Amino acid sequence: MSTPSISFTSLGLVVLDEIRFPNQEPLLDVLGGSGAYGWFCSAVFRATLGARLFLRPPLSRTLGWMIHTGHDFPELMTDRLRSWDSTLIVKREADKPSTRGLLENTPLLSAKAYHYLETPQDMQTRLSALLSLRNEAGEPDRPFIVWEPAPYVCKPENLQPCLSAAQHVDVLSPNHLELAALFGESPAKAHDKATIEALARRVLDSGVGIDGKGTVVVRAGENGSVVVSRDLPPTWLPPFYPAGADGRQHSKVVDPTGAGNAFLGAYVVGYLQTQNAVEAACYGTVGGSFALEQVGMPELVSGEDGELWNGADAFERLREYRKVVGL
């Protein structure tokens, strides 16, 4: 069987979480779950999930990812990942866990798009290495790069490094709290849409992407998301599961951890298919909605009626959402 052309690859850590709740049995071996470091551990799974939702077989095989697993990584989990029918490369370490995979000599090197969760310093280093490897492999075309800043570096002292790194990526996507923290604003200010717009514009004005043609996408919790670029005024999209009039969380929201990662995976697929940032954010919103309906990953069932995730069709949900926002 020939190797498929890869459209999307997410680069990040792969860790099984153990989640402990007061007065409850712990949840063990949660694939891409929450937990103390869940935002980092789940990133590659959630982003890949978001992309996979909108890449049905055989297009699912254009979704490429590599995971390094330790000797104790459950085979059941590996089988579940393989059931997604993607291009999954599993490197098992017999004596120690390893959390990063190398792109050398793999089909992932020719991907059309990459998602990174990195510090600004590592972002520039890894992107430079990626482009060098691609050039050596005869892949001179520049891929589409989405950068999600590592949350723990979103502090005022890292603002300038983040702005510098943003000049080398196509999409910069912090969440609202991370964006506010970068500029030294309080968490309360992060919930104000005007503040988020103003900060996103400041980032954009400093230069995002080659020739300043990049996009800032802020994932803003209960406010949804906002897309800002040089050619696009701030465009807000509501969350798929809005809070009630009393401010209470929607009943379908079980665990929001990782929804932002899934948003970005789906965003990339949407952008590759439509070349439109707002349309891509619709994909992202719907992709994120599947990630927050449970702890861990949604259930995939394939049958005569196609693929259902948690009993729902991703494309039907996308059509429903586009009607809501008037697209």
Q: What spans do the regions from the language model cover?
A:
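Short, electropositive alpha-helical surface patch
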Residues: 74-88, 131, 232-242
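Conserved phosphate-binding/catalytic loop of the ribokinase/pfkB sugar-kinase fold
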Residues: 83, 91-125
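Conserved phosphate/ATP/ADP-binding segment of small-molecule kinases
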Residues: 134-144, 149-244
